[in-house]
Amino acid sequence: MSRSRWLPNQHGAWAMLAVPFLAGTFLGHPRRAHLPLLAAWLLGYLAVYHAQQWLRLTRISRNPKAPRRHVRPAWVFGSAGAAFGLWSAAPHPWLLLAGACATPFIAINSLYAYANRERSLLNGVAAVIPACGMLLVALRLGGGSWGAGVAPALACLLYFGGTVPYVKTMIRERNSRAYYRGSVAYHCVAVVVAALLTPWLAAPFAVYLLRAALLPGRGLKVGVVGAVEVLCSLALLGAVLVAF
């Protein structure tokens, strides 16, 4: 397996991994302890990704070499992630419990990978929840309280949860009126809920609604769709830091 294929071609995942973590870090007090935790978080994601690809390909591929290509990256990333995780947890044992909370969601993602249904709506939502939960973890590590992190974590969940149906309307389900209507309806509700969390979030979530309503069907290239989501993710990070 070439080195370039060690990193998954899932650009949206990186924003989902980074934005809640960075929001939690800067809503609290950034510390050196955040660095090994961030490394453990990203390496853990890479390890799980390759493990799930091995699981999927072991079942569906007729080429025995296909699943084997993911074994080495899974072990390398997993070992490195575990090392950084233990480094983080040694002075903060509660991080082990926080990590365990992600287990049910990883199990759901693994079941969908085994069934070769990774593009399922529920599978996407199951991936979003622990990613947004990292805001709580990073905030607590920086001296903040769990309670202070609930509203900003919900804001992240509202946005990244909405990207699951929205991106489908731009690519795989671009011809589905049902997905389009569902995505727009979700974003309408998200604007209201976000505004209830804090009025500061009304403007960015109104923009997210407009992009969900206006961009599908315009034939945008995948790269453009990704660039728009990067900008939206950065806007979310800025809004959360200002609002909370």
Range-by-range predicted roles:
Residues A190-F244:
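C-terminal transmembrane-bundle signature of multipass membrane proteins
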Residues H34-Y45, L95-F105, G149-Y159, W200-A212:
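Hydrophobic core segments of alpha-helical transmembrane domains in multi-pass membrane proteins
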Residues M1-H92:
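N-terminal topogenic module of multi-pass integral membrane proteins
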Residues A82-W87, P93, G99-A138:
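Intramembrane alpha-helical segments
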Residues L22-L38, A83-L97, G133-A153, V192-L201, ...:
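Helix-coil boundary and interhelical linker segments in multi-pass alpha-helical membrane proteins
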Residues A18-P20, R68-G81, V125-L139, Y180-V193, ...:
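Small-residue-rich segments of transmembrane alpha-helices in multi-pass membrane proteins
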